[in-house]
């Protein structure tokens, strides 16, 4: 999968999508939701079914995160994407924030109302991100809440299916070692550490 520079976005679609997401957030009992440009694998390239940030905002850059509250929304991007973020999003919906100067945790600490409850999909954030966000919200009496269901996925009616392709085993010359040797070493490590599983 390679990044496409021919992607066209339509910011006019965002208003209806954000409204549906906000209704879902109200049903879930949260004030806001974080939408990163990430998938469950934290890779640089995400499949179409994981382009949540592009779907909700219109922004198609390769890095960013949106914070959508009931009354306001922000798109955090680094300097590479400031102009693209402004061009691809509805300025009546999204305020562009410099991700480097004001990371989401720092922003939430100072800009969200006391007691704000922000939901997130724990599959789409690293543990370190979640800790920073939880700490920032906690300082204002708020909470970061891991949601069982991604509310954006629930309102994305025409979401593409996940990719389904055959698994390809790389020859030893590319992988360095045979898969059976790697698995044997992993099994030995599990046994040596008295673990029952490895992820």
Question: Residues of each region from the PLM?
Answer:
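Terminal domain-start leader segments
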Residues: 1-199
């Amino acid at each position: 999968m390679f990044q496409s520079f021919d992607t066209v976005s339509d910011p006019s679609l965002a208003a209806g999508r954000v409204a549906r997401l906000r209704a879902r957030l109200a049903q879930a009992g949260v004030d806001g939701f974080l939408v990163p440009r990430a998938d469950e694998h934290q890779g640089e390239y995400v499949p179409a079914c994981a382009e949540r940030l592009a779907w909700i905002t219109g922004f198609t850059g390769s890095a960013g995160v949106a914070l959508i509250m009931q009354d306001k929304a922000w798109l955090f991007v680094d300097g590479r994407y400031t102009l693209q973020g402004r061009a691809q999003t509805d300025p009546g919906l999204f305020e562009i924030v410099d991700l480097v100067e004001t990371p989401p945790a720092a922003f939430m600490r100072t800009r969200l109302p006391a007691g704000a409850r922000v939901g997130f999909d724990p599959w789409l954030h690293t543990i370190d991100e979640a800790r920073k966000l939880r700490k920032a919200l906690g300082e204002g009496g708020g909470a970061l809440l891991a949601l069982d269901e991604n509310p954006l996925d629930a309102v994305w009616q025409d979401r593409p299916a996940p990719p389904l392709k055959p698994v390809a085993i790389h020859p030893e010359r590319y992988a360095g070692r045979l898969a059976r040797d790697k698995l044997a070493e992993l099994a030995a490590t599990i046994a040596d550490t008295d673990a029952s599983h490895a992820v």
